[in-house]
């Protein structure tokens, strides 16, 4: 913890002791100052009592604590002499030691052992004496500015620093709010769209329910009107029925009975006519079905006859072709059986006419060329 809160300016031990000797007054003077502290404003006293034992390193390095800046202004206005005197001492020390920034810029020595102890003593002194703490802080800031000439000097005005810090914070907050608002807006839009869709669906559902209710009401009204009409018809028919049921004279009763008989006869006649019509319709249907069946049978028979005729014609043609083939085959056979010389001799041999008184040699008759020999009878197929 002590190393984290040490001062950022690191100097050799000899220079550090000289600076401490010049900056810190003697112990007796410090004790006198502690015994008789200068009166401070209420704000400085409150903040001095509330200052912690260990000051954060960030505020020590940058010197941008807003509360300290305000206190520095108030305390600096009330005690300008002390502040100016200390600044002059620092400037004199820097003029006497011109080699310090070169050494510091060239190589920063590593912190030695007594540094944590010195840091704790300084923190203890700063916590006890707020005036010394503020003055030392200002001196350290001026030393840092002179020792690090390349470093950008931070604004010493606490109001400007606070303004910039507030601007940065406001910008960061604005960016964070914008980033947070974008998903929130998208979610809100989605929710709004979902609500609109739900409302539209509810409206449609309500419209459908209203339409169904209207249809039901309309149907109910129609049914009621029909029932009313039937009721009126019954009411209109009821006087006639009442007249019929009332006690009447003999003539009226006979007329009434005659009318009833006529009605019954007409009903019976109508029923008989309907039955007769139904029977005629059934008979006509049977006739039509029978005619259709007969027609189908005739068509089937005609088709069968045609097929048989075709088959018989085909068989007759085949037989005729077979006979022609057989005849041709027999002629070829005869031609092959007769030798060629005999056929020529038969053609050249003269015919002798017998003379009366001469004995004629009986020779078997030979068939002339081209005549067909009688083949053994073959069974003939019956012609169709």
UniProtKB/Swiss-Prot annotation:
Q: In which tissues is it expressed?
A: Keratinocytes of epidermis and other stratified squamous epithelia.
Its recorded name reads Involucrin
Q: According to the UniProt record, where is the region Disordered? A: 1-384
SS bond list = none
What this chain does, per the entry, is described as: Part of the insoluble cornified cell envelope (CE) of stratified squamous epithelia.
After translation, the protein is modified as follows: Substrate of transglutaminase. Specific glutamines or lysines are cross-linked to keratins, desmoplakin and to inter involucrin molecules.
Gene Ontology biological process terms from the UniProt entry:
keratinization
Q: Which residues cross the membrane?
A: none
Q: Which family does it belong to?
A: Belongs to the involucrin family.
Question: So which domain of life are we looking at?
Answer: Eukaryota
Keywords (A to Z) from UniProt: Cytoplasm, Keratinization, Repeat
User: Key word RNA-binding present in the record?
Assistant: no
Where is this chain compositionally biased, Low complexity type? 137-146, 239-267
Subunit record text: Directly or indirectly cross-linked to cornifelin (CNFN).
Q: Which residues fall in a compositionally biased region of kind Basic and acidic residues?
A: 56-65, 80-134, 179-208, 268-308, 315-336
Localization, per the record, is: Cytoplasm
- InterPro entries attached here? Involucrin2, Involucrin_CS, Involucrin_N
Annotated gene:
IVL
Recorded GO CC terms: cornified envelope; cytoplasm
């Amino acid at each position: 913890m002590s190393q984290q809160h040490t001062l950022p300016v690191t100097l050799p031990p000899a220079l550090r002791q000289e600076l401490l000797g010049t900056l810190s007054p003697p112990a007796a003077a410090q004790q006198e100052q502690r015994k008789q502290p200068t009166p401070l404003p209420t704000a400085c006293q409150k903040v001095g009592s509330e200052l912690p034992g260990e000051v954060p390193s960030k505020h020590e390095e940058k010197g941008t604590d807003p509360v300290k800046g305000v206190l520095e202004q108030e305390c600096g206005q009330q005690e300008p002499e002390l502040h100016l005197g200390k600044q002059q001492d620092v400037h004199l020390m820097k003029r006497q030691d011109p080699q310090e920034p070169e050494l510091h810029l060239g190589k920063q020595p590593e912190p030695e052992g007594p540094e944590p102890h010195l840091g704790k003593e300084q923190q203890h002194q700063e916590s006890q004496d707020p005036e010394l703490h503020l003055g030392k802080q200002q001196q350290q800031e001026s030393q840092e500015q002179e020792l690090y000439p390349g470093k950008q000097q931070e604004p010493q005005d606490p109001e400007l620093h606070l303004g910039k810090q507030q601007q940065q914070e406001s910008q960061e907050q604005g960016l964070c709010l914008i980033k947070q608002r974008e998903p929130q807006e998208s979610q809100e839009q989605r929710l709004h769209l979902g609500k609109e869709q739900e409302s539209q669906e509810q409206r449609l559902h309500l419209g459908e329910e209203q339409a169904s209710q209207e249809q039901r009401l309309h149907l109910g009204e129609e049914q009621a009107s029909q029932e009313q009409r039937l009721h009126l018809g019954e009411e209109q028919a009821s006087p006639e029925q009442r007249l019929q049921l009332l006690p009447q004279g003999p003539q009226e009763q006979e007329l009434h009975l005659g009318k009833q008989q006529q009605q019954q006869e007409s009903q019976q006649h109508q029923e008989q006519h309907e039955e007769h019509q139904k029977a005629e319709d059934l008979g006509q249907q049977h006739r039509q079905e029978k005619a259709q069946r007969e027609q189908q049978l005739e068509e089937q028979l005609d088709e069968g006859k045609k097929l048989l005729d075709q088959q018989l014609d085909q068989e007759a043609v085949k037989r005729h072709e077979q006979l022609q083939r057989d005849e041709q085959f027999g002629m070829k056979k005869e031609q092959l059986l007769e030798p060629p010389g005999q056929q020529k001799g038969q053609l050249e041999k003269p015919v002798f006419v017998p003379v009366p008184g001469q004995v004629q040699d009986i020779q078997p008759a030979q068939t002339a060329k081209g005549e067909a020999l009688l083949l053994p009878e073959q069974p003939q197929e019956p012609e169709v």
